[in-house]
Amino acid sequence: MAGFKTLDDLKDVAGKRVLLRVDLNVPVKDGEVTDTTRIERVAPTITELSDKGAKVILLAHFGRPKGKPDAEASLQPIAHAVEAVLDRRVHFASSCIGEPAKKAVDEMTGGDILLLENTRFHAGEEKNDPEFTKALAANGDIYVNDAFSAAHRAHASTEGLAHLLPAYAGRTIQAELEALQRGLGDPKRPVVAIVGGAKVSTKIDLLTNLVKKVDCLVIGGGMANTFLAARGTSVGKSLCEHDLRETAKQIMIDAAEAGCAIILPVDAVVARKFEAGAETETVDIDAVPEDAMILDVGPKSVEKVKEWLDRADTLVWNGPLGAFELSPFDKATMEVAKYAARRTRESLLVSVAGGGDTVAALNQADVSDDFSYVSTAGGAFLEWMEGKDLPGVAALQK
């Protein structure tokens, strides 16, 4: 990974104070963490540094407390979840700067792990304020960023600290960037991208960037309806951003000029109601009834996607093909996910996927572990796919 240092470059950390930025923005219900995936992702970096004798000081944000302390957004309950995942004692300090932080850090010995309170309890965090960044840096000798999911934000703990202390990429960021490099940076071709989800409006930058970089773009979900409408196909009562038809047309023109094939549904599963047990029918795409909604792509469309996956060396996936959260409209997404997973297991495909709905869909299909890489980074993954610079990553590149 050219351009920045990883933990492999960090030779002697015994007794050093390592400020480690992690993503602990996990779901909590009634004071209990309900999903520890993000903690599990950063556990290898925490334990590696601890095992090497570093004083590991965890920096993280949680929720949106608007720059002031808020008991609802305290990281204290999360410290217990981190302890459970690591199977190690995790100390807690009631502030990330000032006397409480200094006292807790001063009491540490090599190998100890300390979680500091929510960085967003201070307005200086999101403003990337130099004074606040200095106050954070006062408790560290080395900075390691392992929060790729926050790398698209130029905040004090994700970007500012990298300018004040020797900066390194943690194992999560390293794995993420290496996977993304394989996916779009320097991929094996042909590259197929699957982009789904409800709205074109949220993914214009993404689609515009992808048509210049991939060989085939499969468009699914509600956003496919806008492209179908732009082509003059009636989509009945389906979710459709009719005001973006010209944008969709331009993306199709750009794709043609770049030599990128665009694959739209050729058939669809439609229903009059979006509810469990609704009566459905499968129709050709130019025969959608006026009173029906497209809620999934049909079997002919799935076969078309599979044909492209047979030719592809690389797959980048963001967004489901249909309304997968409600059966039977999950069928196309599940089938394509399982097919891509099989091709990956057979070493015929490099598969990189990301985005909340995509991760949920792959978990539903029980194939997350079969993909080459599944990003939990959300907004950062999307901005990377859009071709944008990520401040938290750029700050590590020296």
Swiss-Prot record:
GO terms for biological process: gluconeogenesis; glycolytic process. Keywords: ATP-binding, Cytoplasm, Glycolysis, Kinase, Nucleotide-binding, Transferase. It comes from Chelativorans sp. (strain BNC1). This is Phosphoglycerate kinase. Pathway: Carbohydrate degradation; glycolysis; pyruvate from D-glyceraldehyde 3-phosphate: step 2/5. The lineage of its organism: Bacteria, Pseudomonadati, Pseudomonadota, Alphaproteobacteria, Hyphomicrobiales. Belongs to the phosphoglycerate kinase family. It is an enzyme of class 2 (transferase). It catalyses: (2R)-3-phosphoglycerate + ATP = (2R)-3-phospho-glyceroyl phosphate + ADP. GO terms for molecular function: ADP binding; ATP binding; phosphoglycerate kinase activity. Substrate binds at D23, L24, N25, R38, H61, F62, G63, R64, R120, R153. The keyword Ribonucleoprotein does not apply.
